[in-house]
Amino acid sequence: MFVDQVKIYVKGGDGGNGMVAYRREKYVPKGGPAGGDGGKGADVVFVVEEGLRTLMDFRYQRHFKADRGQHGMSKGQHGRKSEDLIVKVPPGTIVKDEKTGQILADLVTHEQTAVIARGGRGGRGNSRFATATNPAPEIAENGEPGQERDVILELKVLADVGLVGFPSVGKSTLLSVVSSARPKIAEYHFTTIVPNLGVVETGDNRSFVMADLPGLIEGAHAGVGLGHQFLRHIERTRVIVHVIDMSGLEGREPYEDYVTINNELKEYNMRLTERPQVVVANKMDMPDAEENLQAFKEKVGDEVKIFPISAVTKQGVRDLLFEVANLLETTPEFPMYDVVEESEASVMYKFDAESLKFEITRESDGTFVISGYDIEKTFKMTDFSRDESIRRFARQMRGMGIDEALRARGAKDGDIVKILEYEFEFID
């Protein structure tokens, strides 16, 4: 089964917790703090495996959660960093953030890697918080939460040449004649429902990969007839071979087919029209084909070069392959996406720097709800089992301006303040 789009969940490993510990050694009075830092959580890393051809495996496993870092230990020992979680994907995979639509990675070459969900850093042990005024702190941080997100994986086949056209114009037959590929061929529409790839050798030591793409219909750019699923596979091709049925047996007019398919390519993605297109008049072995070809030439004009062929008898196929090979030698690749490098601040929330700190809303029962990347991260990294850590968290909230903001919103003594799923009492 060919699967070319899936949605999965990925989560980087949480950082290990820092430790509160003290040096206890004979003849060393007042040894001081000796709690180690936690280890970094593992990243979720996508790696291209050239042997894969489909996203089928992701139908059965949709959640990928990396291991957390090891906790800090006594005697100043830091926790171990966890090994990254490796997820193998086929070449041609594009990774998008499901929430924002941002392109995270375009993976095309063997063993190419991309970090899709970063692991959190380890929490600091109490030895990190020692000062002249507080030489034996009872403070340690929890590990930073790992990044988590839903992502969309899209597979766009890696081919140099794409065969496009209406259903039943002979694309699959042409591919089977010029390569060792054996696509399904039958006398009904949409026999081809998944892309078929074949390696074409021209006989003069040149070769290229050709893709037989499922037939298009009018409205494909808007998703009609699974158009989006089919058209995405054209995006990576460098040369488009437009196959047109000249027999007239399907009751369609060749010029109308030509215009309709080109409009679909243009409407789907403007850059598809930048690629060189080879127009192929197929089924020239049929009775009315020559007459239909002459009428077609009159309508398209002399500027369009047409290759009359018969995929069944192989008439004209050799000249077609040489033309395609010549075009490939002079046509560069067309990058479809600019992958944006993420900064840590933009990993999960796409706001400006100020809005990342916190936001205060009020529920119908009067509870104040505080949310935002910075405050939630600070909250998760606080060890609330220790009084000194709680006091530090209160100072951090004041430093962010949360106390003042709550007063400005009308908060009074005894009001309930909520962060994530935890509730606190506001004391002025």
Curated annotation (Swiss-Prot):
Domain of life according to the entry: Bacteria
- CDD domains linked to this entry: Obg
InterPro entries, from UniProt?
G_OBG (IPR031167), GTP-bd (IPR006073), GTP-bd_Obg/CgtA (IPR014100), GTP-bd_prot_GTP1/OBG_C_sf (IPR036346), GTP1-OBG_CS (IPR006074), GTP1_OBG_dom (IPR006169), GTP1_OBG_dom_sf (IPR036726), OBG_GTPase (IPR045086)
| Enzyme class, first EC level, given as a word | hydrolase
Residues forming the OBG-type G domain are 159-329
User: Sorted alphabetically, which Pfam families does this protein's record hold?
Assistant: DUF1967, GTP1_OBG, MMR_HSR1
Is Translocase one of the keywords? no
Domain OCT spans what residues?
Answer: 350-428
Which positions does UniProt annotate for Mg(2+) binding? S172, T192
Q: Name one GO molecular function term.
A: GTP binding
HAMAP family, alphabetically? GTPase_Obg (MF_01454)
The entry sums up its family as follows: Belongs to the TRAFAC class OBG-HflX-like GTPase superfamily. OBG GTPase family.
Classification via PANTHER family: DEVELOPMENTALLY REGULATED GTP-BINDING PROTEIN-RELATED (PTHR11702), MITOCHONDRIAL RIBOSOME-ASSOCIATED GTPASE 2 (PTHR11702:SF31)
Assembly with partners or alone? Monomer.
State its role.
Answer: An essential GTPase which binds GTP, GDP and possibly (p)ppGpp with moderate affinity, with high nucleotide exchange rates and a fairly low GTP hydrolysis rate. Plays a role in control of the cell cycle, stress response, ribosome biogenesis and in those bacteria that undergo differentiation, in morphogenesis control.
From the Swiss-Prot or TrEMBL record, give the protein name.
Answer: GTPase Obg
> What organism does this protein naturally occur in?
Bacillus cereus (strain G9842)
Quote the gene name from the UniProt entry.
obg
